[in-house]
Amino acid sequence: MASYPCHQHASAFDQAARSRGHSNRRTALRPRRQQEATEVRLEQKMPTLLRVYIDGPHGMGKTTTTQLLVALGSRDDIVYVPEPMTYWQVLGASETIANIYTTQHRLDQGEISAGDAAVVMTSAQITMGMPYAVTDAVLAPHIGGEAGSSHAPPPALTLIFDRHPIAALLCYPAARYLMGSMTPQAVLAFVALIPPTLPGTNIVLGALPEDRHIDRLAKRQRPGERLDLAMLAAIRRVYGLLANTVRYLQGGGSWREDWGQLSGTAVPPQGAEPQSNAGPRPHIGDTLFTLFRAPELLAPNGDLYNVFAWALDVLAKRLRPMHVFILDYDQSPAGCRDALLQLTSGMVQTHVTTPGSIPTICDLARTFAREMGEAN
């Protein structure tokens, strides 16, 4: 092959330029890395925060357990962020919970179509999710890196949340899809809106035998609720799949690589109680991903349309970093409280980002509770 001097000179010039560019970039990166290292050292000197999200199917005893735990601490070191009942019932819309249950009942009785029910359910679920999503966004600037859990000193502040945003933006929409009152497209639209998972996100899911769960749910009184056993079975199934999905992802599972292992479009059978991270990695068929092998989401060649595949990528990205714990609710309220307290010792704290973050977070949590915590 012929060799051309001009090309040789150009090549030599390019090599010199690249070498000089790499050198300049290395020089430029040094101050940046030094600054980042300094910021990390400063952050590590900041107070720590423990955030605990008590989640899972309704009616297990989450709120009672949480309130008993909060009562153990002082007002200054543990703050409870309750369900935003006032927003659901008054501020965001009128009687949202009753509207949801009535709509499902009318669909089950054949009084309205699935399409009509889906319109109402999707709108109502937006109302249910808004307070969680916006609170997460306001809190995010104050959350620094994870401080670890082993041998960590007590946090300066513990925040106990009655549910994480995924309850309203993933789990309940997915359960309504199983109930026939929401489309899979709408569920993935909610998935796309799940906020990025903050460091130190500790989520407590619950385990309770179904018969005991039914008994507890029948005895409680919540505004607008109906005893819907089919919905209870659906939401229990979804939370079981959620726990499996986190284990699957943290165990190295990739939904894109394993998608071909799903066959047909059948909804998975009801599974066992949520399990901790112990044990083998679940099969993709025992995760939330199996719900989305639905005809409405598939292209003619049988693959997911890209827009829906991207939503599943978001789902994987949001769930993978979560720290999931399982609380056994099949015991007395005091026993549940003590078991939850024991779980917190293994949870992951985070540093806050500024010296004023702790009082700011306290004010945020108390404002939320005061404005939205109780229905008027």
Curated annotation (Swiss-Prot):
Changing P173R: In strain: Isolate CL20; acyclovir resistant. Its EC number is 2.7.1.21. Substrate binds at Y101, Q125, R222. Residues 1-39, 260-280 are annotated as: Disordered. Changing V348I: In strain: Isolate clinical h20. ATP binds at G56, P57, H58, G59, M60, G61, K62, T63, R216. Residues 19-32 have a biased composition (Basic residues). Changing P268T: In strain: Isolate clinical CH/1, Isolate clinical LA/1, Isolate clinical LA/2, Isolate clinical MA/1, Isolate clinical PR/1 and Isolate clinical PR/2. Changing D55N: In strain: Isolate CL17; acyclovir resistant. It holds the Pfam family Herpes_TK. Gene3D superfamilies: P-loop containing nucleotide triphosphate hydrolases. One of its GO terms (biological process) is TMP biosynthetic process. It catalyses: thymidine + ATP = dTMP + ADP + H(+). The keyword Glycoprotein does not apply. Changing V191L: In strain: Isolate clinical h3. Changing T158I: In strain: Isolate clinical h13. Changing G251C: In strain: Isolate McKnight, Isolate clinical LA/1, Isolate clinical LA/2, Isolate clinical MA/1, Isolate clinical PR/1 and Isolate clinical PR/2. Changing C6G: In strain: Isolate McKnight, Isolate clinical h21, Isolate clinical h22, Isolate clinical h23, Isolate clinical h24, Isolate clinical h25, Isolate clinical LA/1, Isolate clinical LA/2 and Isolate clinical MA/1. Used in molecular biology as a selectable marker to identify transfected eukaryotic cells. Used in cancer suicide gene therapy to selectively kill transformed cells. The active site is at E83 (proton acceptor). Changing L42P: In strain: Isolate McKnight, Isolate clinical h21, Isolate clinical h22, Isolate clinical h23, Isolate clinical h24, Isolate clinical h25, Isolate clinical CH/1. Homodimer. Catalyzes the transfer of the gamma-phospho group of ATP to thymidine to generate dTMP in the salvage pathway of pyrimidine synthesis. The dTMP serves as a substrate for DNA polymerase during viral DNA replication. Allows the virus to be reactivated and to grow in non-proliferative cells lacking a high concentration of phosphorylated nucleic acid precursors. This is Thymidine kinase. It comes from Human herpesvirus 1.
